[in-house]
């Protein structure tokens, strides 16, 4: 899911508020800095005795609402490590990148698309090694966000694997398995909750947008002509879920993506955003992905990922 969030506001009052929140979370046992006795580790956090219960309650409330209370959604728990071909088919190996720029003086790195722009020109941040001067930014380079590792004792290209950057692909590659072992038929959904990993250039604020995080994801497979109808349905369902969770309406909004923001697989995407101390940031993305994913995996794997509707006497890719 594409995240489009405002950068942190450096207003002193908001910075103080964030510091108070972080300190409160530590005192109350909600969240601790990871590896705290060693000075912490950038953008990693541990959930304490109270925090882990709170997080568990949220996950269970989501799973109950999305799976257990519905007849047309089932759950799975896919592996974090998957065959590299999965990421080739999904486009992550070639295209899961952010534009990276680096200051030639202080060597700080920034996401180019998150820097402010004025009259078509990027406004460079202030350089910590130059008094009252801006950073000298080089040309943007594409930086792949996936964490690479090796499976087995030999570190060579034949043993390369990746920590999954999203939970969606584990759902798509199990489409036929779920179809064959349940009585489900489109429209139906597959959901899972699990860890994902993204080597973010500039991690976000506190536990928002970290390199290791948990996703709650559901993919809903429908006949092609029903896509727009179900897209509207899930936008309303998901907003209601956040309201029922106790969020104030003035602090949450549904923001449709502009056409130039849409991912290559999407014909429509909306973000559910929350008003954080630093501005609006994405909590959840709802996308009409069409048949892109199943077709891509069918082409790369050589497996038939279509569905035959006996009533309509029609075969299609949901």
Residue ranges and their predicted role:
Residues 2-318:
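TRNA-recognition modules of translation machinery and tRNA-sensing kinases, especially anticodon-binding
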């Amino acid at each position: 899911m594409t995240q489009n969030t405002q950068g942190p506001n450096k207003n002193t009052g908001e910075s103080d508020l964030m510091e108070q929140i972080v300190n409160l979370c530590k005192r109350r046992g909600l969240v601790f800095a990871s590896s705290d006795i060693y000075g912490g580790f950038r953008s990693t956090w541990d959930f304490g005795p109270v925090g882990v219960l709170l997080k568990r309650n949220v996950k269970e409330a989501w799973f109950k609402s999305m799976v257990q209370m519905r007849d047309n959604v089932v759950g799975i728990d896919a592996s974090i490590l998957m065959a590299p071909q999965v990421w080739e088919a999904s486009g992550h190996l070639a295209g899961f990148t952010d534009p990276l720029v680096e200051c030639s003086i202080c060597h700080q790195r920034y996401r180019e698309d998150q820097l402010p722009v004025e009259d078509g020109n990027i406004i460079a941040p202030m350089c910590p090694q130059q008094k009252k001067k801006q950073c000298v930014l080089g040309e943007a380079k594409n930086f792949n966000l996936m964490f690479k590792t090796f499976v087995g004792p030999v570190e060579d290209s034949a043993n390369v694997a990746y920590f999954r950057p999203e939970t969606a692909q584990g759902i798509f590659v199990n489409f036929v398995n779920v179809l064959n072992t349940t009585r489900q038929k489109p429209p139906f959904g597959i959901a899972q909750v699990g860890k994902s990993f993204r080597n973010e250039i500039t991690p976000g604020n506190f536990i928002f947008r970290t390199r290791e995080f948990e996703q709650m994801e559901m993919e809903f497979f429908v006949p092609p002509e029903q896509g727009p109808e179900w897209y509207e349905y899930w936008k309303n369902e998901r907003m209601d879920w956040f309201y029922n969770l106790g969020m104030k309406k003035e602090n949450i909004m549904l923001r449709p993506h502009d056409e130039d923001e849409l991912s290559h697989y999407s014909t429509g995407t909306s973000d559910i955003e929350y008003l954080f101390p630093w501005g609006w940031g994405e909590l959840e993305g709802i996308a009409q992905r069409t048949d892109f994913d199943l077709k891509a995996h069918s082409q790369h794997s050589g497996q038939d990922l279509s569905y035959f509707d006996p009533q309509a006497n029609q075969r299609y890719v949901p």
